[in-house]
UniProtKB/Swiss-Prot annotation:
Organism from which the protein derives: Pongo abelii
GO molecular-function term, one example from the UniProt record: nucleic acid binding
CDD domains (UniProt xref): Enpp, NUC
Residue spans crossing the bilayer: 12-30
Enzyme Commission code(s) on record: 3.1.4.1, 3.6.1.-, 3.6.1.9
Cytoplasmic topology ranges: 1-11
Name the UniProt record assigns to this protein: Ectonucleotide pyrophosphatase/phosphodiesterase family member 3
Cofactor binding notes: Binds 2 zinc ions per subunit.
Gene name per UniProt: ENPP3
Chain sites annotated for binding ATP: K204, N226, E275, Y289
Motif (Cell attachment site): 78-80
Subunit structure and binding partners: Monomer and homodimer.
Active-site residue numbers: T205 (nucleophile)
Amino acid sequence: MESMLTLAMEQPVKRNTLKKYKIACIVLLALLVIVSLGLGLGLGLRKPEKQGSCRKKCFDASFRGLENCRCDVACKDRGDCCWDFEDTCVESTRIWMCNQFRCGETRLEASLCSCSDDCLQRKDCCADYKSVCQGETSWLEENCDTAQQSQCPEGFDLPPVILFSMDGFRAEYLHTWDTLMPNINKLKTCGIHSKYMRAMYPTKTFPNHYTIVMGLYPESHGIIDNNMYDVNLNKNFSLSSKEQNNPAWWHGQPMWLTAMYQGLKAATYFWPGSEAAINGSFPSIYMPYNGSVPFEERISTLLKWLDLPKAERPRFYTMYFEEPDFSGHAGGPVSARVIKALQIVDHAFGMLMEGLKQRNLHNCVNIILLADHGMEQTYCNKMEYMTDYFPRINFYMYEGPAPRIRAHSIPHDFFSFNSEEIVRNLSCRKPDQHFKPYLTPDLPKRLHYAKNVRIDKVHLFVDRQWLAVRSKSNTNCGGGNHGYNNEFRSMEAIFLAHGPSFKEKTEVEPFENIEVYNLMCDLLRIQPAPNNGTHGSLNHLLKVPFYEPSHAEEVSKFSVCGFANPLPAESDCLCPHLQNSIQLEQVNQMLNLTQEEITATVKVNLPFGRPRVLQKNVDHCLLYHREYVSGFGKAMRMPMWSSYTVPQLGDTSPLPPTVPDCLRADVRVPPSESQKCSFYLADKNITHGFLYPPASNRTSDSQYDALITSNLVPMYEEFTKMWDYFHSVLLIKHATERNGVNVVSGPIFDYNYDGHFDAPDEITKHLANTDVPIPTHYFVVLTSCKNKSHTPENCPGWLDVLPFIIPHRPTNMESCPEGKPEALWVEERFTAHIARVRDVELLTGLDFYQEKVQPVSEILQLKTYLPTFETTI
């Protein structure tokens, strides 16, 4: 009640005050109107030529304006410049765009670009001259073009190709800040874009830029990091050293050379490798790197290259911006600096598109806008110090998000350095350790990061947002960084494209940047050099593909291992459950399938056709069983692959238990080509595993089809823990989630860790006094129908794949499984070694899905697809 009384007493006072304010405002408003009218009338009475304006009078020594103001070069020293001298005569020489004030200006020799009436004739107009000064619709405001044909002006017989890189532009930026980037967002809307483009590992600037113009993995083209040492050259490479211009570092054939070798000209405005005489040649036109050159000047120069006479004009161009990478390092990916940088690069990109439109090239040029990698936030309290693991640091370390360790004394100790001991000392040391140490050959095969002497043998795979460094003296933390696992969402890069060759208003699934080189060759209609990409896998980006892929032709034909005798000629295998030859003959007779049974098992267990063998001189035969089919390699004495289909769990009864300690010889395989059971003695670290799991059989009798020597593969005992858990638990889970899966699995031999199948002589080197070679890896490819209402064997459309390439090692130290059940680490281990079907093909010499009724280019999309499990950014 007291507060209400107080309020009532104050109201009269407030009303009086309000009345005074109203009167004061009315008086001020009246005065403002009078002053405005006075100024307007006063100015209106003066003649324009006596206003003292420098418009069209800049640096005219004879001009005298109002009160004798001047516009000549010395007016500032005299202090008699006209009021608009700075804006008209000085500022106009510093900007790259027109405005209404500049339109029709007197030509200024010092201008960056011109808005004078004769600029079109003299080819020095600012990029937006037509839209600002002649009233044409700007590129940004123009509707998306939907013409099916190229709209090139006279003199442009074929569309030029512009490759534009914005360093460190992570894909998420375009989703989060799209409204702040109207020009780039329009390109995304009108053209084609991927959800993201995957960078190669390590996700660094030089390796990925060179990969983009090469189609090669860093291990193949030699630029394996921004900083590296080559023991053969005995030199160090860094971004700040002159060594980066030494052609000895740069292997392969970059895009500009591919174009030049086939009669085209190429121009690069900054690109890693363009300043080195690779194969003895530079690009037709190139600019030495200078980070201080304004983005607008770079764009203006590229536009001038497009103005060159036809005989001199390049067909292929590159453009490079350091942003938003520079700002991302300084402030982190979520910062005001990055937002400002995105606006700057968007403005510069808009200048390019406006300049193209002014030349009527905006629907003629094929332009690709991409990035080399993304950006991750780092923190100074997320650092792993090697001094916490070693009492003394006696090695050299490349620090950061993708660390490598080598000998400190080089070249003397380079090859003798004990890398294995370093990895052991860094493995499973802490429960909350934020990196995994690897010997480089043991890294996930999908990375293709091993076969190069510049890749040091010790590698640390670091958790997101963490850095690994030598000691606490390293304070280079905070802000942003990159180089991490290329599956991290923060490392995802942008890819957008627009032009007469590209589809419009389309989003495509992610792909890897090794595929861009082949795409650019197709745009230029030239033949690519050999590369790691899969030619034709990006045909779905194009309106009319230039290259039509076909399935690889099989190199080694198969035979059928025939059934001759129901009893083995000789055998050292035992199966106590088969007590006499009659029982043995009965189960062996099950291997003798009729043609109808063969047709039935092929339909279910090879729904996409058998894998074709692309290795030379491989003697192999097909072995048919009711529950699986395998391709048996006679020289290796083991199956090269086995294929079977696991139905959805609800479609089958509980599986019968497996008969223990039962093995017998496969009577279809001669003893000279078969494994012996005595090979797997208890005193060895090797035991036998089954490529097709006997427990997957639907009846107790049919499991005997799997308990045979032709289904055996050698496995380390520790590896079988992981292998068995996958087949008994995870495989059932995947089949349940996907309405059944087709499984193809087999051994891999990659002793020289080059990512390709080993030749027989390479395998023979590693037999170690045994007749059976030990695989370096095993692969598993799960295939299901993308439409989960269909099973694999009756899938009418697109397929889904889940391939794994699992290292075959004596220990499971990678997963630190001590005291943990398999449920806590096996699935994570498989996930860490996810791969593409194409990776499996390269490592096995097999070719998949040849009988799937689908265009080959779509099959290649499937083969180059890499499943990911990352959700955090």
